[in-house]
Amino acid sequence: ANHPIQFYAATKRSNELMAHSYSHMFQIPTTGLRFFTVYGPWGRPDMALFKFTKNILEGKSIEVFNHGNHLRDFTYVDDIVQGIVKTSRNPPKYDPSFDHFDPDQGKSSAPFRILNIGNSNPVTLMRYIELIEHNLNLKAKIQFLPIQDGDVEKTYSDISRIQSLVSYTPNTDVEVGVKNFIKWYLQYYHQTEPK
């Protein structure tokens, strides 16, 4: 995103630009990886899947922004790991076709690249919640709220470049991923069934 609309995105982009400068100055092969809505076991407890699962199990309401109209490219953690491993085995190289007098924004004189790692199949937030409900066999109490400032309505990862470079293919659809997470969550927190 060359025109970020929030500080979080701006910090990510500035990190990529600093990494490019470092790669250029010291000719260190560098790959920036952009992860798209990572979820799964051992994830961050402040993320939606954790918060929604915990609140549904405790009978508390969940806050759903943009009145549930978000689309997210949910990517299961195993698919992220696959992308990292494959990418690490194929470092970027200097592009001899780069022209300093007529620079193409998609190329670099440094051994540098940015790759998206995602599922490339956006799912509605409401579908995601339905899958959580189904796997818990409980209904969520939903509090619909307007979209938050700086939030985007849809995320979608174009994974064509990582597919062509390292044969990355996401293998986990959201139905399987949410099911795996719920099973892990219940075992980890010693709950065999919802309260």
What do these predicted regions represent?
Residues 12-13, 17, 21, 25, ...:
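Charged/polar positions on well-ordered alpha helices
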Residues 56-195:
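C-terminal substrate-binding subdomain of Rossmann-fold SDR/epimerase-dehydratase oxidoreductases
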Residues 1-32, 43-44:
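Catalytic helix-loop patch of NAD(P)-dependent Rossmann-fold dehydrogenases
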Residues 36:
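Proline-glycine-enriched beta-turn/loop adjacent to the NAD(P) cofactor-binding site
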